[in-house]
Amino acid sequence: MLDPSSSEEESDEILEEERGKDVLGSAASGARLSPSRTSEGSAGSAGMGGSGAGAGVGAGGGGGSGASSGGGAGGLQPSSRAGGGRPSSPSPSVVSEKEKEELERLQKEEEERKKRLQLYVFVMRCIAYPFNAKQPTDMARRQQKISKQQLQTVKDRFQAFLNGETQIVADEAFMNAVQSYYEVFLKSDRVARMVQSGGCSANDSREVFKKHIEKRVRSLPEIDGLSKETVLSSWMAKFDAIYRGEEDPRKQQARMTASAASELILSKEQLYEMFQNILGIKKFEHQLLYNACQLDNPDEQAAQIRRELDGRLQMADQIARERKFPKFVSKEMENMYIEELKSSVNLLMANLESMPVSKGGEFKLQKLKRSHNASIIDMGEESENQLSKSDVLLSFSLEVVIMEVQGLKSLAPNRIVYCTMEVEGGEKLQTDQAEASKPTWGTQGDFSTTHALPAVKVKLFTESTGVLALEDKELGRVILHPTPNSPKQSEWHKMTVSKNCPDQDLKIKLAVRMDKPQNMKHSGYLWTIGKNVWKRWKKRFFVLVQVSQYTFAMCSYREKKAEPQELLQLDGYTVDYTDPQPGLEGGRAFFNAVKEGDTVIFASDDEQDRILWVQAMYRATGQSHKPVPPTQVQKLNAKGGNVPQLDAPISQFSGLKDADRAQKHGMDEFISSNPCNFDHASLFEMVQRLTLDHRLNDSYSCLGWFSPGQVFVLDEYCARNGVRGCHRHLCYLRDLLERAENGAMIDPTLLHYSFAFCASHVHGNRPDGIGTVTVEEKERFEEIKERLRVLLENQITHFRYCFPFGRPEGALKATLSLLERVLMKDIVTPVPQEEVKTVIRKCLEQAALVNYSRLSEYAKIEENQKDAENVGRLITPAKKLEDTIRLAELVIEVLQQNEEHHAEPHVDKGEAFAWWSDLMVEHAETFLSLFAVDMDAALEVQPPDTWDSFPLFQLLNDFLRTDYNLCNGKFHKHLQDLFAPLVVRYVDLMESSIAQSIHRGFERESWEPVKSLTSNLPNVNLPNVNLPKVPNLPVNIPLGIPQMPTFSAPSWMAAIYDADNGSGTSEDLFWKLDALQTFIRDLHWPEEEFGKHLEQRLKLMASDMIESCVKRTRIAFEVKLQKTSRSTDFRVPQSICTMFNVMVDAKAQSTKLCSMEMGQEHQYHSKIDELIEETVKEMITLLVAKFVTILEGVLAKLSRYDEGTLFSSFLSFTVKAASKYVDVPKPGMDVADAYVTFVRHSQDVLRDKVNEEMYIERLFDQWYNSSMNIICTWLTDRMDLQLHIYQLKTLIRMVKKTYRDFRLQGVLDSTLNSKTYETIRNRLTVEEATASVSEGGGLQGISMKDSDEEDEEDD
């Protein structure tokens, strides 16, 4: 240990000053210190304060008056300061009052200091020699707690990550998760409060994030080759990197390892240091007490324990004699109490007896075996306890080291010499050989023997040079009789020389070291005489042998003997110093061992040896009387004063210096005090409270759990000093309750352990084998039970703040379990579930009010912060609605957190808390009902026919409908009742609005396609089409009938309907119907019947609106066709194609807007489809009729060339005459070309502009067939006439081009090569042959025969 001499001067001065203040004196052995809570409170230890209820409970008993009277006897005297030539004070009474207060303060501080020093002595002894407890290795490891500064650092690191200031690469999903974690968890005031309470660790932060992301990751779509677990582990690794920041992970790991080690096993030095801090002991005070108490001497500590246990047995007998019992709940417990006291001491004796005798100074925390061997403990029957000589056999180890020899003069320098060594009865060893000129070795021989006085022989030999010599020549020898007390260093010994050796002055330098076995406590030569043993006054060699922790014997030995000659078992003897006995010569310093009927007198040769013997025997006898050397008594008497005797054994050479130092510094009273005279219940209460303060202020998130080292010391203290288990746990519970009530986070499981122990004890279940119950224990238990119930109910009421984000893990469940236990009337009868539910229901009802009040306050703070930016903004209905929506978001967030973090008992498959889910649902409904009041108030002030409140419904409904417990609950139904009329009104107005827009739109419809309209609009960024969930239609007209503005194509329409070329009115109609249905669908109306009604109504509305659109388009189509040209100049207008496209869109939209899943509702869709099909057929028929009319016009022109008409003859004559002089153009080709151009253009326009291929095919098929039928009919009418050459050329060109054009447009061959076409082809072929014969010039290359050249020429 450290030498305290360095601090001695300074400490001496300090304590000399303090001694002038008159130290509280105490009686030599009797003053019982009774700690007072007032003095403890003035000690200034962190977090102590006043204890409130229960203050001073432990200060009862009879000790309080003793301490106070002792203090009052010699306190600071005000007169000593007021005397002398001091100027007169204007107000002596005031000054004296101040002095009195100062005196009382100093007196309390001194009393507190002395109490702590005394307590530290008891704690030191527990640490130095534990024999009951060990440091537990199975305790849950506590995490390092987060401080406010660390929390801020973590916030900054996450903010830096979100700002992109770190090197950590992350995708958007992870960024969103971190953003949410940062906003919801790290910035939460509940987390700040948890940090302040000391219950937040880095592991808590990590677990909350892990739980936070698990749902997010599970909801992500599957990615091939990447499992969800891989994503989770990757995200957690990134989280750790953010949390750690730039810190070197190796340093963090090293720090964590070190902290983990300190949480497991502490060395003695670490424990001393810890309790110095806990009790406020200075280093030099520790050093003085350590040395004076001989804490490094296990024999002294074991002896101290034996004395303490003997004192406790005597105290039990005294209590029984004087009938000074504590007040028990039953009179019959008094006798039981004595039995328990004795039984507990016997158990401690058994524990001590089971300790190995060879226990050294090292600190072994092995599991101690409980011995049930009562024969050694029972001191009544000596016959059972007698030792035989074989019981005290000792085993010694000897080391013999031969250094060198001197005096070899007669031998030649080169002669070989060597030595042998042996312990009598053992083997013989030999050194190496050396020359006579330099006989040095340094050789060690190791021996073992059972002789207490062994004979060690060392012989010196030289090698014989004679031829016939059989053995070497012995030159000399030495025989030594070492003892464990012999000098250990090498010494010169004169050798006994052999007869024929000329060198007579041989000396040998050697060392003999004989160890001291652990069970040999002292040895040496003493003069002795006794009645039963050692009956002659004679000097003998004695060994004090420890056979077991409670059995010692004084044994006398003779040389070369393993067993003692005689022995005296020291049980029941008392050793003390005596004066020299007359008539006994041979010893100088006398002492004796006395027992009823026997006295043994011992004498040593000097005073020092006597002190050592008395000290060793004092430890062995276990006597209460402390022998004081006559020299020490003289010293004490010379100093004067009534100083208590020293408990620490004092020697003239080592112990005396420590004792003098301790006495000089006023420590002797703490060392010599008898532990049995103290109220250990109140002392333990104090040390446990101070230890808890220290624990809660260290760097661990302990939640009230002591560290293993602290548990070990407190366990040992309780066992060694007889602190009742119930008292210990009651004090612990009270201290924990005080901390919990002041905001510290305490583990409910820890409270449960102590409460269950106390409840079991108070109800007579003997959890620690103690059956007696005091009235004080019962009363304190009932008081603490009530305090605990109030605390637990308060914690459940404030569960969001006492267990934020479900931390500490399992704490809420443990709190419910503990409350259920607290509500039990006894430990056997379980409390009815309904009673527990009633209590918790009441708590959760209050919790709803607390949570909503705090949420409203938070929302108002947010609102005020925003209003600060918008100063002067009035609280309009819109503002109220905006605030309500924000409040709804917070309400949902709270309910989601409750479900995620506070529904743990419901997760359990067991039925212990199966009802918790129901109560949490009730809590949620109560919470929502409070919100409903504010929501209703905000909705009431909204103007009529406004739809801004629908997002509020969507927000709440989307949350409620997915919650199994809240869906269609009380609040959910209230929400539906509130919004159902609004939805109906909205649909009514939308229906009127859309109907009106159809009516007006078609009146003004230009039938230009939307593409053409939007291509002329300015290029703008297209918004997200999913955003406008509620169509922004001006339906809030006071008259109620919505007035639709003139349609102008919005910028988004091209993006949505990029493939369509419908009209503006139709596209607007379809979008509005779709938006309305999407909006209603997105409402996800929870009530099935009303939802179906809404859907059915919207489908019917869509059906009616589309039907109206189709009919209006059909009418417009017919009107448009009637206004167009009937000649080959006709070109299919864009509007005609747009109308076809409206039909296409109508059919596509009807599938989506009019169809329902089940039964009769399909009729809407099928009716509209039939209408569209019929209308399209009619439109195709009308258009084909238009084409046929144009063809008939062409054929009418050709009819003028019929054979026999005036025009035909005139034309023929004119052409023939003119052709002689000029090149006349081919007659009829202009008509044919005009028709072919009309057909091709019409085909191209229709193919390009109409979006439905099926309609085009049907149109072309019908058009081709109708055309061929008209031509065939025209030719049939002229069956008897030969076609004019011009008619023939025109028809051939028209028929061939029509056939090829329709084939290119995809008309099937089966349609093209119809019988009608074949009839036409055959007729024209015949006519062509006839013409080629009758006309000399022929047809000028025009023929019905297929020819590529002709095609090229014609094209």
From Swiss-Prot:
Region named Interaction with DRD2: 792-1131
Comp. bias (Basic and acidic residues): 96-107
Ranges where the PH domain occurs: 519-622
Region Mediates targeting and association with DCVs: start-end pairs: 1179-1355
Pfam name, any one: C2_CAPS
Region of interest (Disordered), ranges: 1-107, 1331-1355
Keyword hit for Transport: yes
InterPro entries xref list: C2_dom, CAPS, MUN_dom, Munc13_1, PH-like_dom_sf, PH_domain
Modification type Phosphoserine: residues: S34, S89, S96, S259
GO MF, one annotated term: metal ion binding
Domain named C2: residues: 378-493
Gene Ontology biological-process annotations: catecholamine secretion; establishment of localization in cell; presynaptic dense core vesicle exocytosis; protein transport; synaptic vesicle priming; vesicle organization
Keywords: Calcium, Cytoplasmic vesicle, Exocytosis, Lipid-binding, Membrane, Metal-binding, Phosphoprotein, Protein transport, Synapse, Transport
SMART domains, A to Z: DUF1041, PH
Membrane topology designation: Peripheral membrane protein
Outcome of gene disruption: Mice die within 30 minutes after birth but do not display obvious developmental or biochemical abnormalities. They show a strong reduction in the frequency of amperometrically detectable release events of transmitter-filled vesicles, while the total number of fusing vesicles, as judged by capacitance recordings or total internal reflection microscopy, remains unchanged.
PROSITE patterns: C2 (PS50004), MHD1 (PS51258), PH_DOMAIN (PS50003)
Tissue occurrence: Present in brain and adrenal glands (at protein level). Specifically expressed in neural and endocrine secretory tissues. Strongly expressed in almost all nerve cells of the brain, although it is absent from glial cells. Expressed in the cardiac atria, but not ventricles.
Induction and repression of expression: In the heart, up-regulated by hypertrophic stimuli.
PANTHER family for this protein: CALCIUM-DEPENDENT SECRETION ACTIVATOR (PTHR12166), CALCIUM-DEPENDENT SECRETION ACTIVATOR 1 (PTHR12166:SF6)
Complex and partners: Homodimer. Interacts with the dopamine receptor DRD2. Interacts with RASL10B.
Role this protein plays: Calcium-binding protein involved in exocytosis of vesicles filled with neurotransmitters and neuropeptides. Probably acts upstream of fusion in the biogenesis or maintenance of mature secretory vesicles. Regulates catecholamine loading of DCVs. May specifically mediate the Ca(2+)-dependent exocytosis of large dense-core vesicles (DCVs) and other dense-core vesicles by acting as a PtdIns(4,5)P2-binding protein that acts at prefusion step following ATP-dependent priming and participates in DCVs-membrane fusion.
Domain notes: The PH domain is essential for regulated exocytosis and binds phospholipids and plasma membrane. It however does not mediate binding to DCVs.
Protein name: Calcium-dependent secretion activator 1
Organism: Mus musculus
